UniProtKB/Swiss-Prot annotation:
Residues 1-30 are annotated as: Disordered. This is Translation initiation factor 1A. Gene3D superfamilies: Nucleic acid-binding proteins. Residues 23-96 form the S1-like domain. InterPro entries: NA-bd_OB-fold, RNA-binding_domain_S1_IF1, TIF_eIF-1A. It comes from the Archaea. It comes from Methanosphaera stadtmanae (strain ATCC 43021 / DSM 3091 / JCM 11832 / MCB-3). Keywords: Initiation factor, Protein biosynthesis. HAMAP family: aIF_1A (MF_00216). Belongs to the eIF-1A family.
Length: 111
C-alpha cells in the first residue's frame, strides 16, 4: 500500500457544502420529534419547544453528555417517553446549522 507524501491530505477530503453537494441528514423516524432548545436547566436537562407545539423537559443521555455540547437555539431531535410523553423526552441527536436549514426547507422543522 502506497503512503501519500501529502501531509495535508486530510484537508483535501473535507465536504464543502457550499458547492451544492448533497448532504446526509438524519431525518426524524417514527416517534421522534424535532425541536429547538429554549433553555438549559443544568444537570443534563433542557427545555425544548417541539414541532407539535409542546414544551418538553428533555434530558441528555449519559453517552451524549461529554461528546455533544448543546446550546440554546440548537435544533435537536427528541424521543418522548412512553409515559408522560407530553412533558418529558430524551435528546437523541443535535443538528448542525446546515442540517437544520435543510430540515426547514424539506418541511420537517416547522417552528
Amino acid at each position: 500500500m502506497k503512503k501519500s507524501n501529502n501531509k495535508n491530505n486530510h484537508k483535501n477530503n473535507h465536504n464543502n457544502n457550499q458547492g451544492g453537494e448533497n448532504i446526509r441528514v438524519r431525518s426524524p423516524r417514527r416517534g421522534e420529534i424535532p425541536g429547538v432548545v429554549e433553555q438549559i436547566l443544568g444537570h443534563g436537562k433542557l427545555k425544548v419547544r417541539c414541532n407539535d407545539k409542546q414544551i418538553r423537559l428533555c434530558r441528555i443521555p449519559g453517552k451524549m453528555k461529554k461528546r455533544i455540547w448543546i446550546r440554546e437555539g440548537d435544533v435537536v431531535l427528541v424521543k418522548p417517553w412512553d409515559f408522560q410523553s407530553d412533558e418529558k423526552a430524551d435528546v437523541i441527536w443535535r443538528y448542525t446549522r446546515t442540517e437544520a436549514n435543510y430540515l426547514e426547507r424539506r418541511g420537517f422543522l416547522k417552528i
